[in-house]
Amino acid sequence: MSTDSLRTSVASYREQFDELDDMIAAQMDRWSIPVLRVAIAVVFIWFGALKVFGISPAGELVASTVYIVDPATFVPILGIWEVVIGICLLYRPLIRLGIFLLFLQLPGTFLPIVLLPEVVFTSFPYGLTVEGQYIIKNLVIIGAALGIGGTVRDE
């Protein structure tokens, strides 16, 4: 095979790869936000329902960080709030409301880092307990909410 022939073959494969890459990227662009909305909605509905029914593994952690309201009242109300967030994310006209409620709720999820560091860290600042990992994963939810919120006018 000559050098020119090899270059032509490589260029042809590169063009085919670029076409395939463009098609895949277009599908990812089309589906990423709807799938993200559903995924985050499922998380909020599921985790919220667990709080409402008193079977959330995070219920005790939430109860330990609430000093103003009776935890027996607050945890189920928080669960309802989370279910509402999830439902809002599933129903397009309510996405803005869901994002708003989410951003009101999320700062509270980081309170144990300040109020209960012994529960969050095995060794500060890197060694996280399971509870700490549960809290830090909320950074992903914040990023997802920003992505969803950034496209709300496009839908």
Residue ranges and their predicted role:
Residues 2-155:
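Membrane-interface extramembranous regions
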